[in-house]
Amino acid sequence: MKIMISGHRNFKLSGYDKEWIQEQIEEAIVFYPGRAVCSKDKYIGVCGAADGVDLWYLELLHSHLLDYHIYIPFEEQDLYMTKKDAERRKYFIGEARITKKARNREMVEDCNEAIVVWDGTKGGTFNCFQQLKKKKKNIYWINPLTKVI
């Protein structure tokens, strides 16, 4: 099962309870609705490796020894990150089971379900959320504004 993540970048996460968000992402990985627990042979993470939510997801997948695919939207993405985040991103790209150049549309097509960290505002995560709904993909929505799942 391929589970993608879409969520806000660091600049949009300021003011939100980041620890709570990370806990909810981990909860979604380990106890995703409809499954008892994740297992290495059945769970593949999918993300774009942006700063913020994407890197948190990759860290959690890595710590649970789960495979992941990275869909890189553009090569210069790391130029918009802190040096530390760019280094972490580079490490995760090197560890990915599959890495390819692709946009949100391809991630939505390739995933079975999605975890979305979204506060309800317009932007890239909103666009991805709309695509997931249109494709009738199951969505585990983590709202950092209201702290509602």
Where are these regions (language model features)?
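Acidic/glycine-enriched connector segments
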Residues: 2-149
